[in-house]
Amino acid sequence: MSLFEDLINSKIRELEDLKRNLLVNIETNIRREADAALSKFSAQLANVESEATLERERIIYNAVVEARRKIAEVYDQMLKDLVNAVYEEVDKMRGAERYVKFLTSLLETAEKYVQTKDVVIYASPKDKGVVEAVARNLGLTGIVAEKDIRGGVVVTTRDGSITVDYSLESLIANKIEELKHLLYQMTYER
């Protein structure tokens, strides 16, 4: 072989080696870029999944909060309706023996608390006559005055130092938690 052929063959081998190395380098670069793109898209996908999960949780949380708010509104309305029903029932019972016994019991308890028979008794204008009769029967002295209450009585000593509020409004306010519990039981134990 001639020198010229040896040089050509040598250059051909170098070119073939370069071609092989070039293919390996190109393949390596393509893999590296593909891995980088895959990592980037995987991270973006993970972020999107995370955002979707957070959005789902936010939607569920908002729905739960809204449901609880509506339930609370319904309970409040039920409680108002129950209190109004009590007031209406008292209005129907005025003058009945059971209501007179109720007023008698309130006045007896108030007398024990204030420890005097000389008292000022405040009553609803609708109850004034009944309260005057019950007070006389119990031996209470003093006056019976009208007050803007729905029922029951407010008893105070003449000097005003002790007051016992047994108005229907006060009695209901003191029992409001029991009424809420009763409503809850009635709703969930059916």
From Swiss-Prot:
It is a peripheral membrane protein. Signal peptide: none annotated. InterPro entries: ATPase_E_C (IPR038495), ATPase_V1_Esu (IPR002842). It comes from the Archaea. Its main location: membrane. GO terms for biological process: proton motive force-driven plasma membrane ATP synthesis. GO terms for cellular component: plasma membrane; proton-transporting two-sector ATPase complex, catalytic domain. One of its GO terms (molecular function) is proton-transporting ATP synthase activity, rotational mechanism. Gene3D superfamilies: ATP synthase, E subunit, C-terminal. Keywords: ATP synthesis, Cell membrane, Hydrogen ion transport, Ion transport, Membrane, Transport. It is found in: Cell membrane. Component of the A-type ATP synthase that produces ATP from ADP in the presence of a proton gradient across the membrane. Has multiple subunits with at least A(3), B(3), C, D, E, F, H, I and proteolipid K(x). Belongs to the V-ATPase E subunit family. This is A-type ATP synthase subunit E. The gene is atpE.
